[in-house]
């Protein structure tokens, strides 16, 4: 199972890197809001809720939930970007980013869980 988690984490991290690289080129013009990280963490929260609700076998959940989605989402980058926004005086953006990340993550995790419970 440990190899499944590691393999899943590598897939998630590569997906995060690709989406972040693309997002920095195409979604960051004219804004200080770290949109790629926000999108990654919100979609990750949704899919984690979905995976949890599906009551997958432990090995599948370890691969998808802990591995892929754990490698895909990023708590450390989120917090680093928040510190950067604060240091650069972007308090308004910081406030909205914080709210969107945590509240949005909780809402989307709940939506994913609800959808998964219907399947």
Swiss-Prot record:
This protein's UniProt keywords: Cell membrane, Ion channel, Ion transport, Membrane, Metal-binding, Sodium, Transmembrane, Transmembrane helix, Transport
Cell location: Cell membrane
TM helices/strands, residue ranges: 1-21, 44-64, 98-118
Membrane-protein topology: Multi-pass membrane protein
Activity regulation annotation text: Na(+) is not transported, but it plays an essential structural role and its presence is essential for fluoride channel function.
GO MF terms held by the record: fluoride channel activity; metal ion binding
Reactions catalysed: fluoride(in) = fluoride(out)
Family: Belongs to the fluoride channel Fluc/FEX (TC 1.A.43) family.
Annotated protein name in UniProt: Fluoride-specific ion channel FluC 2
Protein's organism: Lactobacillus delbrueckii subsp. bulgaricus (strain ATCC 11842 / DSM 20081 / BCRC 10696 / JCM 1002 / NBRC 13953 / NCIMB 11778 / NCTC 12712 / WDCM 00102 / Lb 14)
Gene of this entry: fluC2
């Amino acid at each position: 199972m440990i190899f499944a988690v590691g393999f899943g984490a590598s897939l998630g991290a590569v997906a995060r890197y690709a989406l972040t690289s693309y997002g920095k080129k195409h979604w960051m013009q004219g804004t200080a809001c770290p949109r790629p990280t926000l999108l990654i963490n919100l979609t990750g929260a949704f899919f984690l809720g979905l995976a949890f609700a599906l009551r997958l076998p432990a090995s599948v959940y370890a691969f998808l939930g802990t591995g892929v989605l754990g490698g895909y989402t990023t708590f450390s980058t989120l917090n680093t970007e928040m510190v950067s926004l604060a240091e650069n005086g972007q308090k308004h953006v910081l406030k909205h980013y914080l709210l969107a990340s945590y509240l949005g993550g909780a809402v989307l995790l709940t939506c994913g869980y609800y959808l998964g419970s219907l399947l």
